[in-house]
């Protein structure tokens, strides 16, 4: 096979690309993919066939059809699922005989992957040296050993929670209602609310990662128009999704508690939500949420 051969299969594709997550692809490549895949033509496989190969079901594809840029929404939704990678995307395009896409974009995709790897390597080199053997269930540094109000400062008995609450400051009143309904009732759940439970003075990103991954069994996302503008909430959501590819562990629970002017975030669109705005199901809202948070 010549170097310029656009056909890409599992045997010829650079193996490292299968370890590269889809987030490595920048906006330029995604726009070009949309230009190739959005048009519905009888002579070439479009985004709907790609969605089928990715494992999306009929109703999910029908919902994506309502999006202004279905290919972009498809990639956003797929990148949180198990098995999604740049290498797998190229493999599927080859399977669908979209050699035109591979011929034009493969070099740009490889460039994006190299940039992603370079950035990851730089981040790794900036990390402090750590002891090779670390118990994952217990924080081993002073910084992460006393981050909540009831923490053991020495990190021997870290405070644990049923759920981490991802929210914006403007949504704090609803979070307070969650506390009343879930903590101060017979449910007796323990929520991690940053403004109440996290001590000031440490890095918000490190704390969020520690709490979501090691201290909280699940994460509740309070979705609102303000949430969509929050970089902190965006980080927390994507971090939680990365811990449970394909949402197999039911780790993340989105909540919609008031009407929104903006579109619901695409990365959460395929996760069952708790809708507080639906008058027909509002009476069941807290029971459903409490049971979801009580699952082992």
From Swiss-Prot:
Induction record: By interleukin-6.
> What PROSITE patterns does this protein map onto?
DEATH_DOMAIN, TIR
Location in the cell: Cytoplasm; Nucleus
Q: Does the keyword NAD apply?
A: no
Predominant subcellular localization, coarse grouping: cytoplasm
SMART domains for the chain? DEATH (SM00005), TIR (SM00255)
Sorted alphabetically, the keyword list is: Cytoplasm, Immunity, Inflammatory response, Innate immunity, Nucleus, Phosphoprotein, Ubl conjugation
Please name one Pfam family that this protein belongs to: Death
Q: How is it modified after translation?
A: Ubiquitinated; undergoes 'Lys-63'-linked polyubiquitination. OTUD4 specifically hydrolyzes 'Lys-63'-linked polyubiquitinated MYD88. Deubiquitinated by USP3 that cleaves 'Lys-63'-linked ubiquitin chains leading to inhibition of MYD88-induced NF-kappa-B signaling.
Q: Which GO terms describe its biological process?
A: 3'-UTR-mediated mRNA stabilization; apoptotic process; cell surface receptor protein serine/threonine kinase signaling pathway; cell surface receptor signaling pathway; cellular response to lipopolysaccharide; cellular response to mechanical stimulus; cellular response to oxidised low-density lipoprotein particle stimulus; chromatin organization
Q: Cite the InterPro entries for this sequence.
A: DEATH-like_dom_sf, Death_dom, MyD88_Death, Myelin_different_resp_MyD88, TIR_dom, Toll_tir_struct_dom_sf
Tell me the SUPFAM superfamilies matching this sequence: DEATH domain (SSF47986), Toll/Interleukin receptor TIR domain (SSF52200)
For this record, the Gene Ontology CC terms, alphabetical, are: cell surface; cytoplasm; cytosol; extrinsic component of cytoplasmic side of plasma membrane; nucleus; plasma membrane; protein-containing complex
Q: Which residues carry this modification: Phosphoserine?
A: 244
* Protein function: Adapter protein involved in the Toll-like receptor and IL-1 receptor signaling pathway in the innate immune response. Acts via IRAK1, IRAK2, IRF7 and TRAF6, leading to NF-kappa-B activation, cytokine secretion and the inflammatory response. Increases IL-8 transcription. Involved in IL-18-mediated signaling pathway. Activates IRF1 resulting in its rapid migration into the nucleus to mediate an efficient induction of IFN-beta, NOS2/INOS, and IL12A genes.
Q: What is known of its domains?
A: The intermediate domain (ID) is required for the phosphorylation and activation of IRAK.
> What is the name listed in the Swiss-Prot or TrEMBL entry for this protein?
Myeloid differentiation primary response protein MyD88
- Which organism encodes this protein? Mus musculus (Mouse)
Tell me the name of the encoding gene: Myd88
């Amino acid at each position: 096979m010549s170097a310029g051969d656009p056909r890409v299969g599992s045997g010829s594709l650079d193996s490292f690309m299968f370890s590269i997550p889809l987030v490595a692809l920048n906006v330029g490549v995604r726009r070009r993919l949309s230009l190739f895949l959005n048009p519905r033509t009888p002579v070439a496989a479009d985004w709907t066939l790609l969605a089928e190969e990715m494992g999306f079901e009929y109703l999910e594809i029908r919902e994506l059809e309502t999006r202004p840029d279905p290919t972009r929404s498809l990639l956003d939704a797929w990148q949180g699922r198990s098995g999604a990678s740049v290498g797998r995307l190229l493999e599927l395009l080859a399977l669908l005989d979209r050699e035109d896409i591979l011929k034009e974009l493969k070099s740009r995709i490889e460039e994006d992957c190299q940039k992603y790897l370079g950035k990851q390597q730089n981040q790794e080199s900036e990390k402090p040296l750590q002891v090779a053997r670390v118990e994952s269930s217990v924080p081993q540094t002073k910084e992460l050993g006393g981050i909540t109000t009831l923490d053991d400062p020495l990190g021997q008995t870290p405070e644990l929670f049923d759920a981490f609450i991802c929210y914006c400051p403007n949504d704090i009143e609803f979070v307070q209602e969650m506390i009343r309904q879930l903590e101060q009732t017979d449910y007796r759940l323990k929520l991690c609310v940053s403004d109440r439970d996290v001590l000031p003075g440490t890095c918000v990103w490190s704390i969020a990662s520690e709490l979501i991954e090691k201290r909280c069994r699940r994460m509740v996302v309070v979705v609102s128009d303000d949430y969509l503008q929050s970089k902190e909430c965006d980080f927390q959501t994507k971090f939680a999704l990365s811990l449970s590819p394909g949402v197999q562990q039911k780790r993340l629970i989105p909540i919609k508690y008031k009407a929104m002017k903006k579109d619901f975030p695409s990365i959460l669109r395929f996760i069952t939500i708790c809708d507080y705005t639906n008058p027909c199901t509002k009476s069941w809202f807290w029971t459903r949420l409490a049971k979801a948070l009580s699952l082992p």
